[in-house]
Amino acid sequence: MESILALLLALALVPYQLSRGQSFQVNPPESEVAVAMGTSLQITCSMSCDEGVARVHWRGLDTSLGSVQTLPGSSILSVRGMLSDTGTPVCVGSCGSRSFQHSVKILVYAFPDQLVVSPEFLVPGQDQVVSCTAHNIWPADPNSLSFALLLGEQRLEGAQALEPEQEEEIQEAEGTPLFRMTQRWRLPSLGTPAPPALHCQVTMQLPKLVLTHRKEIPVLQSQTSPKPPNTTSAEPYILTSSSTAEAVSTGLNITTLPSAPPYPKLSPRTLSSEGPCRPKIHQDLEAGWELLCEASCGPGVTVRWTLAPGDLATYHKREAGAQAWLSVLPPGPMVEGWFQCRQDPGGEVTNLYVPGQVTPNSSSTVVLWIGSLVLGLLALVFLAYRLWKCYRPGPRPDTSSCTHL
């Protein structure tokens, strides 16, 4: 019985004897690490060995650029916050006949506070579609990125989410395939009284890290709202603003991102605030119905049309760097509604409200013209008949009545 107990005790001490003097550590110890693009992170792998010097090295990444520094008993992997750092490197350590390994999944992400909402304010009592776009993001995965339209701290009930859209951003440097993702909602009636504002909230969920950005969409109130422009006026209604942007990071690594100043107070006619360089929209009345968007913000700036009443594809567009033209196809009367132009890089937008013009109905014009022509012909026939009756051949009639013609 004593021999059996001694054998069991010896077997229980085997793991302790094997691991004695062999400490394998990785810092940070997580198996998944999220790194913001442009930031750096060092992952240290070390091992102690009583039988000499432990051999430790990283494998699975390109080490030709000096991203790995190997020392006796340790190896340091430097992550530079580039998309090429994404992957799963493995640290391997050996001491005598014993070997250990630890894999780390590295995810490089980009989620700047660059939310753009359209329209920039909401008008109660109108059918509206609101869009929210997150720019320069990575990864552009619906499983990682989610959108929400909030009233207060709750999701807006009755808002119909449309299909999200994803496009690749135009980058100055190659090798950084960032994307923009847009979510649109068809809004229900905002009710009376209308809420002061809605919020677009975008959340990126990563391993042990949750990032959130939020942007305000003000709702115009009757006492401070700009009145809709008179449809008979030719003066357009211009809106430029820098809306509130709010960013909060939650999770195991808690970080608070900077937020922008509060939304400027609405004025009875325009809404504007000092901010970055923005595009400007001009209406060319001499060239017929045509809008010109241009930006004087230095070289490398491009502008494009992003919103128009109806379908933007039905308009004629010409884009040339910092200038973009928009006109109706086929040429016709002014279209009433909001037009939006966007500037890249930067994502700044400018909106222009164009009032409709009252044009005569073409069918009514044709009917009036035909009616006038018929009346003229009838008058001519009557005059010809009277002249023929007065001066026809035969017995000379009494022409006293003809003098009244």
Swiss-Prot record:
<dbReference type="GO" id="GO:0098640">
    <property type="term" value="F:integrin binding involved in cell-matrix adhesion"/>
</dbReference>
<feature type="disulfide bond">
    <location>
        <begin position="132"/>
        <end position="200"/>
    </location>
</feature>
<feature type="glycosylation site" description="N-linked (GlcNAc...) asparagine">
    <location>
        <position position="361"/>
    </location>
</feature>
<feature type="region of interest" description="Disordered">
    <location>
        <begin position="255"/>
        <end position="275"/>
    </location>
</feature>
<feature type="transmembrane region" description="Helical">
    <location>
        <begin position="365"/>
        <end position="385"/>
    </location>
</feature>
<feature type="signal peptide">
    <location>
        <begin position="1"/>
        <end position="21"/>
    </location>
</feature>
<dbReference type="GO" id="GO:0030216">
    <property type="term" value="P:keratinocyte differentiation"/>
</dbReference>
<keyword id="KW-0732">Signal</keyword>
<dbReference type="InterPro" id="IPR037413">
    <property type="entry name" value="MADCAM1"/>
</dbReference>
<feature type="region of interest" description="Mucin-like">
    <location>
        <begin position="221"/>
        <end position="257"/>
    </location>
</feature>
<keyword id="KW-0130">Cell adhesion</keyword>
<keyword id="KW-0325">Glycoprotein</keyword>
<dbReference type="GO" id="GO:0050900">
    <property type="term" value="P:leukocyte migration"/>
</dbReference>
<feature type="domain" description="Ig-like 1">
    <location>
        <begin position="22"/>
        <end position="109"/>
    </location>
</feature>
<keyword id="KW-0393">Immunoglobulin domain</keyword>
<feature type="topological domain" description="Extracellular">
    <location>
        <begin position="22"/>
        <end position="364"/>
    </location>
</feature>
<dbReference type="Pfam" id="PF09085">
    <property type="entry name" value="Adhes-Ig_like"/>
</dbReference>
<feature type="disulfide bond">
    <location>
        <begin position="293"/>
        <end position="341"/>
    </location>
</feature>
<feature type="domain" description="Ig-like 2">
    <location>
        <begin position="110"/>
        <end position="227"/>
    </location>
</feature>
<dbReference type="InterPro" id="IPR015169">
    <property type="entry name" value="Adhes-Ig-like"/>
</dbReference>
<comment type="function">
    <text>Cell adhesion leukocyte receptor expressed by mucosal venules, helps to direct lymphocyte traffic into mucosal tissues including the Peyer patches and the intestinal lamina propria. It can bind both the integrin alpha-4/beta-7 and L-selectin, regulating both the passage and retention of leukocytes. Both isoform 1 and isoform 2 can adhere to integrin alpha-4/beta-7. Isoform 2, lacking the mucin-like domain, may be specialized in supporting integrin alpha-4/beta-7-dependent adhesion strengthening, independent of L-selectin binding.</text>
</comment>
<feature type="domain" description="Ig-like 3">
    <location>
        <begin position="258"/>
        <end position="357"/>
    </location>
</feature>
<keyword id="KW-1015">Disulfide bond</keyword>
<keyword id="KW-0812">Transmembrane</keyword>
<feature type="topological domain" description="Cytoplasmic">
    <location>
        <begin position="386"/>
        <end position="405"/>
    </location>
</feature>
<dbReference type="GO" id="GO:0016020">
    <property type="term" value="C:membrane"/>
</dbReference>
<dbReference type="InterPro" id="IPR036179">
    <property type="entry name" value="Ig-like_dom_sf"/>
</dbReference>
<feature type="disulfide bond">
    <location>
        <begin position="45"/>
        <end position="91"/>
    </location>
</feature>
<comment type="subunit">
    <text>Homodimer.</text>
</comment>
<dbReference type="GO" id="GO:0007229">
    <property type="term" value="P:integrin-mediated signaling pathway"/>
</dbReference>
<feature type="glycosylation site" description="N-linked (GlcNAc...) asparagine">
    <location>
        <position position="253"/>
    </location>
</feature>
<protein>
    <recommendedName>
        <fullName>Mucosal addressin cell adhesion molecule 1</fullName>
    </recommendedName>
</protein>
<keyword id="KW-0472">Membrane</keyword>
<keyword id="KW-0677">Repeat</keyword>
<dbReference type="InterPro" id="IPR013783">
    <property type="entry name" value="Ig-like_fold"/>
</dbReference>
<feature type="disulfide bond">
    <location>
        <begin position="49"/>
        <end position="95"/>
    </location>
</feature>
<keyword id="KW-1133">Transmembrane helix</keyword>
<dbReference type="GO" id="GO:2000403">
    <property type="term" value="P:positive regulation of lymphocyte migration"/>
</dbReference>
<feature type="glycosylation site" description="N-linked (GlcNAc...) asparagine">
    <location>
        <position position="230"/>
    </location>
</feature>
